């Protein structure tokens, strides 16, 4: 019996098992407390769709061998720059959303390519360098958000220079995916467009991993020495994975922002990677293995737990900030656990 439990725990994953049990406990507690469960389910579904693409950016990074992409802010900043430029050019509605993505792509590709070249020079220290690369890029863009000559009245400060910390998307494409073909089942709102976009993105990435280039990239991530002996270009495959991760991150922040209804600039992107890394690790990924199923399950568990924990924690301890403390503990604890499972000495 003990052996069976041990095998099940090893197969299912200890973090996933703990978070699943805790999430179920939170749901039961919410029902017993009489909280509006329908609205909480709606929030879980919405956050599942809006955060999913950012977590999806981890898949090509892990599969190509660079590990969890803690430099996700690079892609996020490219997406924010593309979105801000789209607003400056006067695009709105569906055109504003798609133009934001299209404009951000060249920046994300160039940044991902340069970052991939850098990672090839510091093999073995990718996660450490990635973290500080994300911090440095965020700080650099704080200067650029002030210095760049944007003039759109909804974006700049009243003095006429420098972008605001929060840029509203109400007049452009805020909620455009959430409202597309949305419907209600009782008190639960289903954001059809948002879910279609996220699941469609998952399908595209899954198809890429089954292509010739994707298989080569996965082979490099699984065993670089074997890939080299087989005649594969390890460095190029790592660069491709980095570019894809950066591009998906740029698209992901645009999806994320339209769901919230605003862009947040300056220091806001700095810690975006940590939640995304924690989510895919909760889903069952490791620092060396990742699949689309890990993304879907991880996003649902991570965002579901955070969404339900907030009203439950406020109901139990109204004076404190227990839900935020819980988020930090789970997010960083999961990342720490995953890093302890990475073998060294190769």
Could you say what each language-model-derived stretch is?
Residues 1-26, 222-229, 233-236, 298, ...:
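Cytosolic-side transmembrane-helix boundaries in multi-pass membrane proteins
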Residues 1-56, 93-95:
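Membrane-interfacial amphipathic/re-entrant helices at transmembrane-helix boundaries
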Residues 75-79, 130-136, 293-305:
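Central hydrophobic cores of alpha-helical transmembrane segments
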Residues 92-138, 302:
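Alpha-helical transmembrane segments within multi-pass membrane transporters and channels
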Residues 137-209, 318-323:
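Transmembrane helix-bundle core of multi-pass membrane transporters
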Residues 187-264:
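Helix-loop-helix "hairpin" substructures at the membrane interface of multi-pass membrane proteins
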Residues 249-251, 259-328:
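Transmembrane alpha-helical segments in multi-pass inner-membrane proteins
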